[in-house]
């Protein structure tokens, strides 16, 4: 719906599995547990990440409009989709928006064999002329969602994207994904 194939409807199966396993609580009510005029902490109570992320950025925007800056942190949430979506929310209000999150360990550090780091997306958006500035990136070569797309299409991964469980370059999407899930080693570069 937002034009990023790896983060759209393809995620619904994963979310459904997380709901069935009790990892996502569909009835969770995100709650502000700490607040100052310029900051807040929201406990998402393991709810849907997109709903919690939207609430957090909405609150950050309100605080920025009142105080000049708004910083909201979230805990106990789930996958929140596209980091850039939230940064653009602030930009549309004439503000500088910044959004980032952590993720499960899927990246193998340099000279490593085991996935120890998350893809940890980061995004920034700000009003500018003639076009707004927009940056949205992962700290890995590729997102897990993109690996899943290659796997679904039964296509080999491009060279330099992933490592097998022994730390060697791999183009085999099913093996790379299976090793990430099982934490056998390997992952994204």
Where do the model's predicted regions map?
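A glycine-rich phosphate/pyrophosphate-binding beta-strand-loop-alpha-helix module
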Residues: 54-58, 62-102
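Short, amphipathic alpha-helical segments
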Residues: 50-54, 58, 77-84, 114, ...
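General beta-strand structural signal in soluble alpha/beta enzymes
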Residues: 42-44, 65, 70-76, 97-101, ...
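Acidic/polar, glycine-rich intrinsically disordered N-terminal extensions of enzymes
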Residues: 1-3
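Active-site cofactor/substrate anionic-group-binding motifs, chiefly glycine-
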Residues: 8-61
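Internal helical hairpin/lid segments
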Residues: 180-189
């Amino acid at each position: 719906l937002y034009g990023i194939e790896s983060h759209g409807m393809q995620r619904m199966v994963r979310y459904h599995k997380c709901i069935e396993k009790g990892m996502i609580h569909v009835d969770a009510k995100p709650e502000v547990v700490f607040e100052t005029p310029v900051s807040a902490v929201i406990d998402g109570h393991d709810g849907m990440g997109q709903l919690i992320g939207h609430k957090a950025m909405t609150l950050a925007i309100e605080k920025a409009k009142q105080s000049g800056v708004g910083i909201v942190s979230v805990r106990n949430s789930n996958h929140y989709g596209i980091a850039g979506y939230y940064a653009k929310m602030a930009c549309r209000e004439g503000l500088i928006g910044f959004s980032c999150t952590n993720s499960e360990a899927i990246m193998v550090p340099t000279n490593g064999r085991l996935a120890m780091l998350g893809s940890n997306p980061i995004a920034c958006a700000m009003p500018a002329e003639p076009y707004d500035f927009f940056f949205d990136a992962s700290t890995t070569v590729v997102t897990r969602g993109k690996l899943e797309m290659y796997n679904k299409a039964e296509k080999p991964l491009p060279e330099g994207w992933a490592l097998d469980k022994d730390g060697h370059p791999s183009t085999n999407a099913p093996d790379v994904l299976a090793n990430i899930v099982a934490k056998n080693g390997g992952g994204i570069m």
